[in-house]
């Protein structure tokens, strides 16, 4: 058998040639993508016509939900814009593109025919003509101050924030607010004030090992909670929030499973009087018709809608 040995210099030249060809192909593909992006993807600002009454200019590329929030128009989005709650509905009359499969599970055929879309799933790529409910235009966002955050049950907080001076949120029973949750890393033992839990509830927390929990949130999101105070107290917002712990490990193991606790409840339980938090509202259209004489039966799942 004959073995052909290539000179070392020839082998090095072959390797260098291969690397050079690979880099050349990579650069060529990058150049093609950049050219395609320049001519096929809209860049710069676009105009959004809202209810044929107002036109705003906004950068392209983001979701319609985020773009509207940047323009101080806050649409309901209990899931934080992930497309799972189906609440951020708007009519996109022009410029929204095709309805996505993630939207069809939340919209009926009639709604799709009437141009309803989920704002979190619509990308702002060109000028848009949209229609939103008037109630959405009345929603405001405030930097509120925590004035109380005490436990009223073993795992439930009464969370109260004060709106800025002179501000008032006009809400009705059944309305809800949204709280903006920033990225964080929370150690329950370090970051939750045990004095705000109270001596009567601390033994249960220690028994079940809640102070061993940790929670990490990597992106800004929002969560929705019903108001638990009376509408006349519109200069403050009261929420009742239950801590959302991970499920327990299957017996005979003890302790919690290695998953994140609730992001919003962990954040709220870590807040202390004097802390600042972003709240928006009021949202919701499920209200009692007080002018009706018809008998109604109300079922509720927590004290919040009852108390408000």
Where is each model-derived feature located?
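Short, strongly hydrophobic alpha-helical membrane anchors
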Residues: 1-12
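Transmembrane-cytosolic junction motif
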Residues: 31-48
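Membrane-cytosol interface motif
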Residues: 46-62
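Iron-sulfur (Fe-S) cluster-binding segments and ferredoxin-like electron-carrier domains
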Residues: 67-76, 87-137
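Ferredoxin-reductase
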Residues: 147-273
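A short, basic/flexible loop-to-alpha-helix module at the beginning of a structural domain
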Residues: 282-294
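Conserved small/polar residues in nucleotide/adenosyl-binding loops
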Residues: 300-307
């Amino acid at each position: 058998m004959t073995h052909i040995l290539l000179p070392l210099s020839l082998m090095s030249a072959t390797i260098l040639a291969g690397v050079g060809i690979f880099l050349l192909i990579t650069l060529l593909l990058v150049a093609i993508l950049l050219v395609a992006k320049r001519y096929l993807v809209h860049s710069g600002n676009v105009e959004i016509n809202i209810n044929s009454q107002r036109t705003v200019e906004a950068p392209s590329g983001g979701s319609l939900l985020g773009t509207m929030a940047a323009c101080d128009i806050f649409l309901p989005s209990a899931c934080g814009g992930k497309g799972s709650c189906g609440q951020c509905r708007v009519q996109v009359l022009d410029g929204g593109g095709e309805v996505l499969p993630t939207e069809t599970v939340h919209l009926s055929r009639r709604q799709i025919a009437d141009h309803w879309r989920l704002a979190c799933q619509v990308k702002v790529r060109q000028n848009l003509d949209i229609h939103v409910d008037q109630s959405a235009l009345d929603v405001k966002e405030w930097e509120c101050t925590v004035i109380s955050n005490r436990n009223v049950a073993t795992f439930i907080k009464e969370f109260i924030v004060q709106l800025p001076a002179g501000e008032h949120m006009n809400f009705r029973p059944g309305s809800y607010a949204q709280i903006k949750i920033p990225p964080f890393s929370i150690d329950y033992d370090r970051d939750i004030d045990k004095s705000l839990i109270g001596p009567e509830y601390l033994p249960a927390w220690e028994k079940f090992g809640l102070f061993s929990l940790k929670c990490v949130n990597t992106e800004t999101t929002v969560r929705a909670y019903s108001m638990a105070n009376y509408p006349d107290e519109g200069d403050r917002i009261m929420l009742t929030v239950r801590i959302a712990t991970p499920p327990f490990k299957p017996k005979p193991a003890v302790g919690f499973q290695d998953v994140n606790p609730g992001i919003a409840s962990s954040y709220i339980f870590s807040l202390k009087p004097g802390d600042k938090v972003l709240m928006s509202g009021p949202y919701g259209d499920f209200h009692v018709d007080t002018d009706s004489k018809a008998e109604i039966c109300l079922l509720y799942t927590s004290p919040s809608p009852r108390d408000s």
